[in-house]
Regions:
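A ligand-binding cleft/hinge motif common to bilobed small-molecule-binding domains
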Residues: 84-86, 221-238
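Extracytoplasmic ligand-binding site segments that recognize negatively charged/polar headgroups
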Residues: 29-36, 72-74, 78-211, 215
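Periplasmic-binding protein-like
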Residues: 106, 122-124, 187-196, 233-259
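Early extracytoplasmic/lumenal segment of secretory-pathway proteins
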Residues: 20-87
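Mature extracytoplasmic/periplasmic domains
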Residues: 256-316
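Sec/Tat signal peptide C-region and signal peptidase I cleavage site
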Residues: 13-19
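A bilobed periplasmic-binding-protein/Venus flytrap-type ligand-binding module shared by bacterial periplasmic
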Residues: 125-132, 167-169, 250-261, 280, ...
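Conserved C-terminal helix/tail region of periplasmic/extracytoplasmic solute-binding proteins
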Residues: 212, 312-341
Length: 341
């Protein structure tokens, strides 16, 4: 990592802001649009601090390059849980002072970590275009059945959320996925299952791509983030979600070590953690709030379409953060080598 070129460092610093501005980096798309409405603009109105929003695709190498070279230009960063755990262990993120953020007891279990605060609960689900399929799939096993359901499949270009899906398609129960994946035989089994589908896969890297591929007909079904599909449904597109075998987790706010605006970053995270602001976020994208006090503020019909609804979460898989922190690097390397063949 430390051998990264100055060009990479320059690239990661391209989304900089003027002195005094707060740079917040997210995964973009409908998620960022919801954050702008719920957090960015209201925070600026409340504090006078301008929020400059940037985007990335989760490349921790960029964060490490900035921290190692002491050229940090990002103040607040949206990260997935495995990257939060690994980045915290490796000293890439600041430890958070919860006396300046809020009561840990107000958050759903697992959302208040030493280096990060949960923004929302999301799920990677099976989504399909109901205009293309007269009868929809019922789970990941059907995802692999290209005879019964002809057409391309969209899948995330990475080991995470893809190896789990492969095992469930091969008959592994949701509750046993990580137990199996923690063994060499389980990993081999997942890749063998992916081999079967590889000719029919169209890879996606950004969360905005699956709904685009589904609407255009490039794929007939895809793994996808539930909130992105829900937003496309709001636009009148006939996309459907299968919750069985969905993988749910948090995205969290973290502060890169050496942020030039640490105090303002903490104030922003505290602001974004308030129930009234999380309510606005969930109203704009179908992700569950991490502050439990936000749930009673939401319409009951909306709550039923969130990953946190009991009927949706009961057949899902909680993403095993410790597993991906321990094995993520080696599995991603193997996946990249496999995908390149």
């Amino acid at each position: 990592m430390k051998a990264l070129s100055l060009a990479v460092v320059a690239a990661c610093c391209a989304q900089t802001a003027l002195a005094g501005d707060l740079t917040v980096i997210s995964f973009g798309g409908a998620n960022k649009a919801a954050q702008e409405k719920a957090y960015y603009a209201p925070f600026t109105k409340a504090t006078g601090v301008k929020v400059v929003g940037g985007e990335y695709n989760g490349e921790m190498a960029k964060v490490k390059a900035m921290v190692d070279t002491k050229s940090v230009s990002w103040d607040v960063l949206e990260v997935e849980s495995p990257e939060l755990a690994r980045g915290c262990d490796e000293g890439m993120f600041e430890k958070l002072d919860y006396s300046k953020i809020g009561n840990k007891a107000d958050f759903v279990p697992g959302a208040a970590q030493s280096c990060g605060v949960g923004i929302f609960v999301w799920s990677t689900v099976l989504a399909y275009n109901a205009d293309k399929l007269k009868v929809g799939p019922s789970g990941w096993k059907d995802f692999w059945d290209v005879k019964k359901f002809p057409g391309k499949r969209g899948m995330r270009k990475g080991a995470k959320y893809t190896l789990e899906v492969a095992l469930m398609a091969d008959g592994v129960a949701a509750k046993d996925v990580y137990k199996v994946l923690a063994t060499p035989a389980g990993v081999d089994r997942a890749f063998k299952k992916l081999d079967q589908l590889k000719p029919n896969i169209q890879w996606w890297e950004a969360g905005a791509q699956p709904p685009q591929y589904l609407v255009s007909g490039d794929v007939v079904m895809s793994s996808a983030y539930n909130g992105r599909i829900a937003n496309t449904q709001k636009e009148g597109k006939n996309l459907k979600i299968v919750w069985a075998g969905g993988m749910y987790d948090f995205d969290s706010w973290a502060i890169p070590k050496g942020s030039p605006n640490k105090d303002a970053a903490l104030k922003f995270i505290a602001f974004a953690s308030k129930p009234e602001n999380q309510k606005v976020y969930s109203q704009n994208i179908a992700y569950g709030p991490t502050n439990k006090k936000a749930v009673p503020l939401l319409d009951k019909k909306l709550v039923a379409d969130l990953p946190t609804a009991p009927q949706n979460i009961k057949s899902g898989v909680a993403v095993d953060v410790a597993f991906w922190a321990d094995f993520g690097e080696s599995l991603e390397q193997r996946f990249n080598a496999w995908a390149a063949k």
